[in-house]
């Protein structure tokens, strides 16, 4: 019987655009204040792209960063999966653009639309291709340019979102530091709690959809908050209990950076103290599929992430989509 192949994260790369949008900037744009934003979200600034920059541009930089860390060329990558809700265009897939621009000549791939859970979904997709033996080097990317679909006259959403990307390389593990388990869930009854109604086949782009501001994010904040707190905790408990762990065993909890109150409420349900949680939403805002790799990088830079650590990742996104992953850090 062949040995079971497990997948590990062998490299992590990230990128955010240099331009900052601070709470002070937003005070000049909408009726809000730094205190109001900080109390409700925990965000003090977010990075946003300059005009003409797209999701693939961020994803490319993150991918190159990961390759550089691993000492590999793009030609050695066999597949690329991109989690995003802000693709460069409806088609082709942003993964195709990334594949071409980084020079991954032999790679294939596709986009995954799971909103804030997009990186976790891309991570499992990539892991399964490694574990099946189909590929040895696969890249999972989470990237979004949320500023492209935000109405900067809507206080409820413009204070939350930012732009950013992260990429991880997955390879077969040679020790016990690998992706242990995943859990996923969708609940389509929450589709209208967080969505962009315009631009698809239901409401194709027209003068009317533009005038009605249908190409911007619409959110029921209270519904999202309640669902996210409950499901982020439930998904986390599932992967922990299924593998014989408790919250107290976790070295680092890496939640989707949606809102500081959501993060702390979910962590409280898991019995996790703040010194076991990485929170960088104050610096980057909610970058949708980019939040988890950016949070992993923040933890690494702070010296809070080392090889062998038990890491718990969890996210809830539009859809609703839910995802969690338990892993031993390997790089």
Indicate residue ranges for each PLM-predicted region.
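Phosphate/pyrophosphate-binding loops at sites that engage ATP/ADP/AMP, CoA/4′-phosphopantetheine
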Residues: 62-78, 234-251, 299-304
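Flexible, glycine-rich active-site loops centered on histidine and acidic residues
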Residues: 131-165
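Active-site pocket-lining segment
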Residues: 228-233, 247, 251-270
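Conserved catalytic cysteine-centered active-site region
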Residues: 38-40, 44-57, 84-138, 268-296
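Catalytic phosphate/nucleotide-handling subdomain of diverse soluble enzymes
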Residues: 294-314, 320-331
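Buried hydrophobic positions in well-ordered alpha/beta secondary-structure cores of metabolic enzymes
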Residues: 9-11, 37, 66, 77-80, ...
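Condensing-enzyme catalytic core mediating Claisen C-C bond formation in acyl metabolism
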Residues: 1-51, 154-226, 230, 234, ...
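Acidic, glycine-rich active-site loops and adjacent beta-strand->loop/helix elements
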Residues: 15, 83-89, 114-119, 142-147, ...
């Amino acid at each position: 019987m062949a040995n079971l192949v497990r997948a590990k994260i062998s490299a992590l790369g990230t990128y955010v655009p240099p331009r900052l949008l601070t709470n002070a900037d937003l005070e000049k744009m909408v009726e809000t204040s730094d205190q109001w934003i900080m109390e409700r979200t925990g965000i003090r600034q977010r990075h946003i792209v300059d005009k003409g920059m797209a999701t693939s541009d961020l994803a490319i930089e993150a991918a190159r960063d990961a390759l550089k860390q691993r000492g590999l060329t793009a030609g050695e990558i066999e597949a690329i999966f991109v989690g995003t809700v802000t693709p460069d265009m409806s088609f082709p897939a942003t993964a195709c653009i990334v594949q071409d621009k980084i020079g991954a000549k032999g790679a294939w791939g596709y986009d995954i639309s799971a909103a804030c859970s997009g990186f976790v979904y891309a991570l499992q997709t990539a892991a399964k291709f490694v574990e099946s033996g189909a590929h040895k080097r696969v890249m999972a990317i989470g990237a979004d340019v949320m500023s492209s679909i935000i109405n900067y006259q809507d206080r409820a959403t413009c204070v939350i979102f930012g732009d950013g990307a992260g990429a991880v390389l997955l390879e077969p593990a040679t020790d016990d530091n690998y992706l242990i388990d995943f859990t996923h869930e969708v609940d389509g009854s929450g589709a209208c709690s967080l969505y962009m109604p315009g631009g698809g086949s239901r409401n194709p782009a027209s003068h009317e959809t533009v005038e009605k501001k249908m190409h911007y994010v619409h959110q029921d904040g209270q519904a999202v908050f309640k669902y996210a707190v409950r499901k982020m905790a439930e998904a986390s408990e599932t992967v922990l209990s299924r593998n014989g762990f408790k919250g107290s065993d976790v070295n680092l909890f890496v939640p989707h950076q949606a809102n500081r109150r959501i993060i702390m409420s979910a962590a409280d349900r898991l019995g996790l103290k703040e010194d076991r949680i990485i929170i960088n939403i104050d610096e980057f805002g909610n970058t949708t599929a980019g939040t988890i790799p950016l949070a992993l990088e923040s933890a690494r830079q702070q010296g809070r992430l080392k090889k062998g650590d038990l890491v718990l990742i969890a996210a809830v996104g539009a859809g609703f989509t839910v995802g969690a992953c338990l892993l031993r850090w390997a790089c």
